[in-house]
Design a protein with these regions (language model features):
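Short beta-strand-to-loop capping motifs
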Residues: 11-14, 91, 177-181
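Secondary-structure boundary elements
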Residues: 51-57, 92-97, 184-185
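Polar/charged alpha-helical tracts
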Residues: 43-51, 115, 132, 190-194
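Catalytic core of Fe(II)/2-oxoglutarate
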Residues: 119-202
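A structural signal for short, well-ordered beta-strand segments and their strand-loop junctions
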Residues: 58-60, 86-90, 99-102, 154-156, ...
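Catalytic core of non-heme Fe(II) oxygenases with the double-stranded beta-helix
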Residues: 66-148
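Short, charged, solvent-exposed linker or helix-capping segments at domain edges/interfaces
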Residues: 45, 99-102, 187-190
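Signature of the catalytic double-stranded beta-helix
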Residues: 2-83
Length: 202
């Protein structure tokens, strides 16, 4: 049986508070992305990461996905395919999912050069890549894995992934922390499985 290299749930000793900046629904679009300032981070989570000699990047984003099939497009979070990992917290319906994809033979990635206005206007010096990502069209991909995200989760964001919210009434908010090691490099999924072996589960 193939090892799941996409997702794990996490058991944490606290319930992460929902950022107060998540106070507006954006149901006129499929999805909405915004920068989440440090003042909205949960300090208990930051202290918990320190126990593992880890820390969040200074770039943290929030995503809103509308009801009735809203979702992020298929993309990854790095300039090339990789196995970098984020920790996500999600508030919303118990049916919304994250899906992971693999490009079909003969298909090509699209290079995404985002404007990232929501990050640049914060006047910070990003400590991670925000300049280039990969995107793909669903018809050119095979679905590899899908999981309901309803509790804190390790998310492999180096692989192609997207979100889907089938709920008819409730939107989905996510806070995504980019996890860095003490040398400021991005934590890899395999490393995360070892580090969080006592609190990660499928």
């Amino acid at each position: 049986m193939n090892k799941n290299m996409y997702h794990r749930y996490l058991t944490l000793p606290f319930e992460h508070s929902m950022p107060k900046c998540y106070n507006t629904e954006h149901n006129d679009v499929d999805y909405h992305v915004q920068f989440v300032q440090k003042e909205w981070w949960d300090l208990r989570f930051i202290e918990w990461l320190k126990n593992y000699q880890l820390k969040p990047s200074n770039v943290s984003e929030g995503f809103y996905v509308r009801p009735n099939g809203g979702g992020l497009p298929i993309h990854n979070d790095s300039a090339v395919l990789s196995n970098i990992v984020n920790i996500n917290f999600t508030w919303g319906p118990p049916t919304s999912t994250t899906r992971w994809w693999q490009l079909k033979n003969g298909s090509s990635y699209e290079i995404e050069l985002p404007e990232n206005t929501h990050i640049i206007e914060q006047k910070i010096n990003p400590d991670v890549n925000i300049k280039q990502y990969l995107r793909a069209r669903e018809e050119e991909c095979d679905l590899m894995y899908e999981q309901v995200i309803h509790t804190p989760s390790l998310i492999n964001v180096g692989q192609l992934h997207n979100t889907h919210n089938p709920d008819t009434k409730m939107g989905r908010w996510t806070l995504s922390y980019i996890i860095l090691k003490s040398d400021n490099t991005h934590l890899q999924f395999e490393e995360a499985l070892k580090i969080f072996k006592d609190v990660a589960y499928e």
